[in-house]
């Protein structure tokens, strides 16, 4: 710090002609001081009758007004007693390339240069001026830049404050959402534990992700603000310092200033986020209430033996499975296995004939890769052996059923189109969780058949409306070609 002050003082008492400390300093009317010997030599080179002017500012002066400057001479004497470090002197006063005094300013390159630099190829043809001649111009420019940077500092600080406020707001909002979610789930915790856990995990993940990104933005805003402050500090130091400090490296400062663009922080609008609300919970509760209501009509369903069906039925008349593949001995002693060719031959009706009222039952289909179940208006023995694959499964033929294929494809079967009336219209069903247990609700008077995914807390899988029940209907089960049994559940299970 002290060395910097001494360098500034030395610059003020340096002769502009010889660039050394003033010796027997003389001052002109304009205020510039020169060594007595330097000023005398300058007079000799001037025209005898020519007008004398200051070598620095070119202002005319009269010889009789030249006066010794004892004050400056005293400063020089004191300064000679102090030895500046050669590094600092080199850094401030001399050209790093040529070691000459830095006296000139190149307008094209915006650099302080020495007289050898001016004559070099690098600056040939450039406009050069004494530093004092351009100091005022850059004083104005840097002052304007300082004002602009101060404004940017205010903007940066405001952005920093905004991001902190948003971070606090997010934390408050997340905590508020947590409280609401916990309060809503308390009503039916024993049923909705999995929903609560899932939603809270998502919310916490969102909190961590958003706060992490906001923290990153905050760090970037702090760094941005610090960069502006550092540049402001640099400019303030230049503006308060000497001409040398003002102009040295000014090109880099101006480039940094021009290239500085305040980066806006990443934000996360709260109105666009998807958060679990009480309304979502209300949907779940409505489903549970609907399931609770239909379960009041749970009837104990069993299957009836049927000579037409090839299905395997358990002794308690609750389990139905497809027969094992038949072993066939062919010619030359070869052995092959085959399933029953008729898809419908494994279908079977429940023992209950339904002609009115509301009825509900559940079927366990866990571990099965294929099945069909629902309601049937009764077999058509004369026609069934002529029907292949799924063609019979249409409401117009008395089937209101859904099914599973390949372990993942859940479908409903509607009437075929006018172009293909014999083939059913297969409706792919979107189920988040493949059902292991299916509830079937038949409302005979309302002409509806509904299917519920008990595995997914009773969410509706599919509903047939406007059913035409012109005759008694029965529960229907078909294990398909999967030997794993499907089981009719008792009301107490």
UniProtKB/Swiss-Prot annotation:
The modification N-acetylalanine is found at residue 2. Residues 130-240 form a coiled coil. GO terms for biological process: activation of innate immune response; autophagy; defense response to virus; innate immune response; positive regulation of canonical NF-kappaB signal transduction; positive regulation of MAPK cascade; positive regulation of NF-kappaB transcription factor activity; protein K63-linked ubiquitination. Its EC number is 2.3.2.27. Degraded in a proteasome-independent fashion in the absence of viral infection but in a proteasome-dependent fashion following exposure to restriction sensitive virus. Autoubiquitinated in a RING finger- and UBE2D2-dependent manner. Monoubiquitinated by TRIM21. Deubiquitinated by Yersinia YopJ. Ubiquitination may not lead to proteasomal degradation. It comes from the Eukaryota. GO terms for cellular component: nucleus; P-body. It is found in: Cytoplasm; Nucleus. It holds the Pfam family zf-B_box. The modification Phosphoserine is found at residue 85. Its main location: cytoplasm. InterPro entries: B30.2/SPRY, B30.2/SPRY_sf, Butyrophylin_SPRY, ConA-like_dom_sf, SPRY_dom, TRIM/RBCC, Znf-RING_euk, Znf_B-box. Zn(2+) binds at residues 95, 98, 117, 123. Transmembrane segments: none annotated. Residues 281-493 form the B30.2/SPRY domain. Keywords: Acetylation, Antiviral defense, Autophagy, Coiled coil, Cytoplasm, Immunity, Innate immunity, Metal-binding, Nucleus, Phosphoprotein, Transferase, Ubl conjugation, Ubl conjugation pathway, Zinc, Zinc-finger. A zinc finger (B box-type) spans 90-131. The keyword Membrane does not apply. It catalyses: S-ubiquitinyl-[E2 ubiquitin-conjugating enzyme]-L-cysteine + [acceptor protein]-L-lysine = [E2 ubiquitin-conjugating enzyme]-L-cysteine + N(6)-ubiquitinyl-[acceptor protein]-L-lysine. One of its GO terms (molecular function) is pattern recognition receptor activity. Residues 185-198 are annotated as: Required for interaction with GABARAP and for autophagy. Can form homodimers and homotrimers. In addition to lower-order dimerization, also exhibits a higher-order multimerization and both low- and high-order multimerizations are essential for its restriction activity. Interacts with BTBD1 and BTBD2. Interacts with PSMC4, PSMC5, PSMD7 and HSPA8/HSC70. Interacts (via B30.2/SPRY domain) with HSPA1A/B. Interacts with PSMC2, MAP3K7/TAK1, TAB2 and TAB3. Interacts with SQSTM1. Interacts with TRIM6 and TRIM34. Interacts with ULK1 (phosphorylated form), GABARAP, GABARAPL1, GABARAPL2, MAP1LC3A, MAP1LC3C and BECN1. Capsid-specific restriction factor that prevents infection from non-host-adapted retroviruses. Blocks viral replication early in the life cycle, after viral entry but before reverse transcription. In addition to acting as a capsid-specific restriction factor, also acts as a pattern recognition receptor that activates innate immune signaling in response to the retroviral capsid lattice. Belongs to the TRIM/RBCC family. The B box-type zinc finger domain and the coiled-coil domain contribute to the higher and low order multimerization respectively which is essential for restriction activity. The coiled coil domain is important for higher order multimerization by promoting the initial dimerization. The B30.2/SPRY domain acts as a capsid recognition domain. Polymorphisms in this domain explain the observed species-specific differences among orthologs. This is Tripartite motif-containing protein 5. The lineage of its organism: Eukaryota, Metazoa, Chordata, Craniata, Vertebrata. The gene is TRIM5.
């Amino acid at each position: 710090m002290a060395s910097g002050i001494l360098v500034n003082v030395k610059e003020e008492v340096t002769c502009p002609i010889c660039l050394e400390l003033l010796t027997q300093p003389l001052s002109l009317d304009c205020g510039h001081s020169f060594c007595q010997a330097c000023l005398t030599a300058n007079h000799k080179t001037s025209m005898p009758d020519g007008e004398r002017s200051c070598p620095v500012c070119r202002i005319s002066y009269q010889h009789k007004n030249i006066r010794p400057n004892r004050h400056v001479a005293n400063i020089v004497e004191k300064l000679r007693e102090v030895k500046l470090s050669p590094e600092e002197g080199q850094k401030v006063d001399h050209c790093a390339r040529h070691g000459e005094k830095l006296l000139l300013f190149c307008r094209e390159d915006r650099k302080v240069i020495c007289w050898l630099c001016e004559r070099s190829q690098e600056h040939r043809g450039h406009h050069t001026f004494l530093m004092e001649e351009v100091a005022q111009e850059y004083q104005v420019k840097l002052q304007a830049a300082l004002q602009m940077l101060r404004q940017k500092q205010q903007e940066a600080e405001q952005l920093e404050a905004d991001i902190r406020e948003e971070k606090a707001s997010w934390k408050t909002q997340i905590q508020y959402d947590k409280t609401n979610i916990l309060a809503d789930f308390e009503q039916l915790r024993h049923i909705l534990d999995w929903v609560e856990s899932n939603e809270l995990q998502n919310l916490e993940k969102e909190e961590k992700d958003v706060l992490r990104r906001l923290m990153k933005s905050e760090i970037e805003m702090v760094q941005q603000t610090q960069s502006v402050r550092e540049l402001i500090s640099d400019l303030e130091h230049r503006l308060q310092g000497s001409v040398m400090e003002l102009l040295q490296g000014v090109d880099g400062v101006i480039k940094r200033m021009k290239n500085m663009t305040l980066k806006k922080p990443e934000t996360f609008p709260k109105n666009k986020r998807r958060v679990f609300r009480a309304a979502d919970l209300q949907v779940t509760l409505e489903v549970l209430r609907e399931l609770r209501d239909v379960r009041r009509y749970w009837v104990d369903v069993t299957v009836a033996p049927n000579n037409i069906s090839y299905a395997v039925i358990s002794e308690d008349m609750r389990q139905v499975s497809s027969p094992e593949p038949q072993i066939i001995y062919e010619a030359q002693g070869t052995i092959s296995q085959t399933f029953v060719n008729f898809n419908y031959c494994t279908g079977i009706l429940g023992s209950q004939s339904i002609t009115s009222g509301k009825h509900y039952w559940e079927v366990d289909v866990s571990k099965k890769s294929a099945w069909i179940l629902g309601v049937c208006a009764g077999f058509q023995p004369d026609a069934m052996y002529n029907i292949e694959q799924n063609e019979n499964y249409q409401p117009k033929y008395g089937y209101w059923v859904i099914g599973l294929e390949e372990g993942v494809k859940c479908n409903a079967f509607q009437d075929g189109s006018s172009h293909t009336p014999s083939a059913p219209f297969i409706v792919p069903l979107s189920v988040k969780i493949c059902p292991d247990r299916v509830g079937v609700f038949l409302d005979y008077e309302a002409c509806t058949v509904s299917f519920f995914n008990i595995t997914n807390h009773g969410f509706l899988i599919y509903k047939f409306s406007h059913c035409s029940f012109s005759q008694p209907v029965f529960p229907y089960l078909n294990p398909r070609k999967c030997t794993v049994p499907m089981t009719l559940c008792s009301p107490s299970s």
